[in-house]
Regions:
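Transmembrane helix-loop junctions in multipass membrane proteins, especially transporters and channels
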Residues: 44-47, 75-76, 115-119, 137-144, ...
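Conserved small/polar residues in nucleotide/adenosyl-binding loops
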Residues: 195-197
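Multi-pass membrane catalytic core of lipid/isoprenoid biosynthesis enzymes
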Residues: 75-126
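Alpha-helical transmembrane segments of integral membrane proteins
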Residues: 23, 53-54, 97-104, 119, ...
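Interhelical loop and helix-boundary elements at the membrane-water interface
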Residues: 6-31, 84-100, 134-159
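Hydrophobic alpha-helical transmembrane segments in multi-pass integral membrane proteins
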Residues: 160-171
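Juxtamembrane/interfacial segments around transmembrane helices
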Residues: 85-86, 107-115, 150-161, 176-186
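Membrane-embedded alpha-helical segments that form the functional core of polytopic membrane enzymes
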Residues: 33-38, 42-73, 110, 121-133, ...
Length: 197
């Protein structure tokens, strides 16, 4: 594909919309939805409800805020990575300042929406927020530390997200303990397969 052809593709409206979806981590929403759905169904013993879809909305917003933070923290590395040439930040479609504003809008919206449920749910969401920060930002930046990156994803996907879903209908103290191991193993495998696509 020639450089001229690439430029024509980049300028199309469909491409712009798709890059926005990538920027907010749309394709990773399902990674968060899966453990949330499992935790909710085990707790509430129903396959769908308003609470479930409301929870999905919160997880989607949280995932998007995390991905935007990732783009912000990785901007200098992404500029040197040919695979990131279509990134909105790398191309200058969105500024760093606007990215921070969007991140905080999504992050605060996620926390505010969480008040509809209970304090246990809110604590789980706040825990996920903390992991998002230490995973992406200096001086912690767990994503660049072998072992800590997997631990962060395991705690998020295998522990806090299903706990949040469970807490909508049941107290956290009653969460089935053996559930953790199988969920963590399954979701880490799912996550690792997706990031290598």
């Amino acid at each position: 594909m020639t450089h001229q052809t690439i430029n024509r593709v980049i300028k199309t409206e469909i491409f712009t919309r798709l890059t926005w979806l990538r920027f907010i981590g749309f394709e990773f929403w399902m990674v968060g939805f899966t453990p949330f759905f499992i935790g909710y169904v085990v707790s509430a013993k129903e396959l769908y409800s308003f609470d479930l879809f409301y929870g999905f909305l919160i997880i989607a917003i949280l995932t998007s805020s995390t991905f935007i933070l990732n783009h912000i923290c990785d901007i200098e590395l992404d500029k040197k990575n040919p695979r990131k040439e279509f990134s909105l930040l790398v191309r200058g479609t969105i500024s760093l300042k606007t990215s921070w504003i969007l991140f905080w809008i999504l992050q605060l919206s996620c926390i505010i929406l969480s008040f509809r449920f209970n304090l246990e749910f809110l604590y789980c969401i706040l825990g996920l927020t903390v992991i998002s920060f230490v995973y992406n930002m200096e001086p912690f930046r767990f994503k660049s530390r072998p072992g800590l990156d997997l631990l962060s994803n395991g705690l998020s996907l295998g522990l806090l997200i299903p706990l949040a879903a469970w807490s909508i209908d049941q107290p956290l103290i009653e969460f089935p303990k053996l559930f953790f191991l199988s969920t963590i193993c399954y979701l880490l495998a799912l996550y690792l397969s997706l990031i290598h696509i």
